[in-house]
Amino acid sequence: MRFAFIKKDLTRHRLISIGLTICIMMTSFLAASAAQMTIQLNGSISNLLDSAKAPDFVQMHDGTLNEKDIDIFSSKQSMVKAHQIVPMIQIEHVNIRFGHEPAKAGVMDHLFVKQNRDFDFLLNEQNEKLTVNKGEVAVPIYFQQKYHLNIGETLLIEKGAHQFSFRIKAFLRDAQMNPSLVSSKRFLLHNDDWNAINQVFQKKEYLIEFLLHDAAQADAFQTIYQSTQLPQQGPSVTLPLLRMLNALTDGMVIAILLLVCILLISIALLSLRLAMIASIEEDEREIGILKVLGIPLTKIKQLYVGKYAVLACAGCIAGYVLTLIFGDMFAVNIQQYMGNQHSFAHWLIPLLVSIVTAIIIITFSYAVLRKFGQISAAQAIQGGLTSSNHKKQIPMHLKKNRFLPVNIWLGLKDLLSRKKLYTTITCIIALCTFLMLIPIQLWHTLQSPDFITYLGSGKSDLRIDLRQGNHLKENTNEIESMIGEDQGIQTSAIYETTSLQAKSKENTLETLYLETGELSAFPLTYLQGRQPLKDEEISLSVLNADSLQKKVGEKMTLVTNGHEIQRTVTGIYQDVTNGGKTAKALSQPFPQSALWRTIQIQLKPGVNIAEKKAVFEKKATPAKVTDMKEYVHQTIGSTASIVKVVAFFSALAAFATASLMLFMFLHMLKAKDSSRNYMLRTIGFSIKDITSQYITSFIVVLSFGTFFGTIAVNTIGPALMSAGGASLGASSLQWLSPQWVSIVYPVTLLIVNLALTACLLKTFFSRQTTRHTLL
């Protein structure tokens, strides 16, 4: 009997059943895809780090060093399993050509290395240790995508009369420098080629790397190393930070997918409740008869839940199958940069997620039927099952209406009479608006020039970076003179960054990167407090303030070479660069050499940024000159491009889901209101009049749904994104998108939904359909 009932009910409500199944399928597909992507990301990162034998602690150093000092230190540390020093030749973009195309200026450093012997291997696209022959080079995947390179093409390195030509053998994966947030990329050369280039290009940087017996001791070892006088003129990273940086871009996609899943399952549950209530209203007398006949309440519930269990299982199975077929499209970035690491869990976990989705839907179905036990058989036969959903008498009298047309008045009265019913579809439209706008707002925020404030920098037109080297001071002075003579420059400021240590409340030492200069020239936005105004003051990034447990107004101790000095914390700002641990001050507390210098330039109105950039590129070599829009793009461009894809699919899903839910809702209204519409027809109302009444109700419903969804995006949305950005140093993200984004997209959704509603009503209440339905 149960099977016959389910089959008959599915056939009778075919369109509603199909709509619910599609909604459940999309939810299952995205939830399973997010789970699959999480498993693949975790497995691929682990495989990449294991295959490369990634170091547990790395100290970058720009300057000279004494290898014996490091050897002695390492031999005395019981934590250390192995160590190595990796020399890297830095070559400026002006000396590099990819085929016939010169390398473009940007934030990325081009570092040429030999393959390491013991650990920290550079890998091929099969995650195997990469080897190149003489005359060959392996190029980072980042540059493969940027310049659309192919195997066999040529990379040229030129300096004066010296020219080196290499054939591209492979594209490499680098466990340390894969992410775009890391502003250095390593190229692999044969030992002989590296030695030859080393004779021409003298500037080198070093990676001082350590493998530990216990990777969990990386933070403790970092503290020990940084308390010594060993080389540390550069950032330091630990294995957990490498893992986080590799997971950042795809982790953001996973977070967005999970948010979309939550929204879709909320929509599916609301739609399910709507469909179940409509079905119960239609069958209430049959339910009463079953109760009179003594059929147990549990059996009656099973009949109804059985139908939705079939839909849930069908939708979740279809969603899981779609995940197996199309799920990898979300993991393209993972496969390119880290490899395709499949395991049994790659298929099992998404299956379990689909099963859990089905269980949630079935459990919710039982919850909707709870009131069955409170209704007697007599009440059911008399229509008591859904009395709470019957129209309430609203004190609106037609004879008192003087201003509104009759059809608009009747539409509003119907809306107020069935507030619960219309509230459900309003919530669905609000969720669809939220689903559409969140990824779009995030994408526009990542594209905004103002996003530079989350990278620890003030707004400007141009940025010039000078790394530590033989002529850092001379180069800075030369560029400063150029700026002073340039009439097209409105404002400029030079900032110097050094590495020093700070004491936490537990008296442990932690490294921070202190930037000093005229902070008021290009001010930051502070979450708390203000920028430093005196030499005795300092401001901290969010992660530094949390790590050091410092608040605005508190004192902190800075340490270098055994010397200590006190500073007062005046402000806390957001920064996701250099591991998120930076600080700002007016002047350096200790006399020490700079790691790098940054010059920010604001041009006068009307001055062409591209032309001015070209002038500085030509005259300021070897400095890196970057348009700030390019700086943001090169730093987080890969993340923004993936968010753009997710935003497109989210908007598509929002429009499709809203359309599907409207179709289901109107189809249910047509069946529910057949008697009402017949009565209206008999007293002289035309089909056009009835359609106008429905359109009035839906204009209000869709407008409120779109409005509340937009308000939620602009109030709740930033908090959701800030929760994800807190671990990176951006704990208070705000939408930076143009104001039209919050208007154009919701209005488009509203117009499309209204047009769809009008078309569906015209179809549903066409003469032939209406005659068949009403008679």
Residue map of PLM features:
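N-terminal Sec/SRP start-transfer signal
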Residues: 1-29, 305, 391-433, 669-674, ...
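Interfacial "coupling" helices/loops that link adjacent transmembrane helices in transporter permeases
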Residues: 5, 11-13, 270-309, 660-700
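Alpha-helical transmembrane segments
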Residues: 12, 16-18, 26-54, 421-423, ...
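Peri-transmembrane interface segments
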Residues: 37, 41-48, 107, 115, ...
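Membrane-proximal extracellular/periplasmic loop immediately following the first transmembrane helix
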Residues: 46-97, 220, 455-516, 609-611
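A short beta-strand structural signal in non-transmembrane regions
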Residues: 55-62, 143-145, 176-188, 193-238, ...
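Short beta-strand boundary microenvironments
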Residues: 94-147, 452-458, 474-572
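Short helix-loop junctions at transmembrane helix boundaries
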Residues: 317-352, 370, 692, 698, ...
